[in-house]
């Protein structure tokens, strides 16, 4: 069964899907954790507007890495994937900044 909202339209046909993505300032940071392991942290995606779990799942597939959603608003991916994540999110319509 397809997801529907109050209009009864399937989610894929909703003209406002992705509305406001360019207004969200998404920040990508890489942090060094225990044993020298890197973690890519993505924050700034509004969970009220976007399905953050779905985005995290797609990102994990794209970069072939494990990851999680913290506090319902921060995506953490295992490894340094700054450039791949930046391109993926920009293709989705987000405004992305990468911190070195």
From Swiss-Prot:
Sorted UniProt keywords: Protein biosynthesis, Translation regulation
Tell me, what is one Gene Ontology molecular-function annotation carried by this entry? mRNA binding
SUPFAM superfamilies documented for this protein:
eIF1-like (SSF55159)
- InterPro entries in alphabetical order: DENR/SUI1_TIF, SUI1, SUI1_arc, SUI1_arc_bac, SUI1_dom_sf
| Alphabetical list of PROSITE patterns matching this protein | SUI1 (PS50296)
The UniProt record lists the keyword Transcription regulation = no
Q: A GO term (biological process) for this protein?
A: translation reinitiation
The family annotation for this protein states:
Belongs to the SUI1 family.
Q: What is this protein called?
A: Protein translation factor SUI1 homolog
């Amino acid at each position: 069964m397809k997801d529907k909202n109050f209009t009864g339209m399937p989610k894929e046909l909703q003209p406002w899907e992705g509305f406001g993505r360019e207004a969200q300032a998404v920040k990508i940071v890489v942090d060094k954790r225990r044993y020298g392991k890197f973690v890519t942290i993505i924050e700034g995606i509004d969970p009220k507007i976007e399905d953050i779990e779905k985005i995290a799942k797609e990102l994990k597939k794209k970069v072939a890495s494990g990851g999680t959603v913290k506090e319902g608003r921060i995506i953490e991916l295992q490894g340094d994937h700054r450039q791949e994540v930046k391109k993926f999110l920009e293709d989705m319509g987000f405004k992305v900044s990468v911190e070195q």
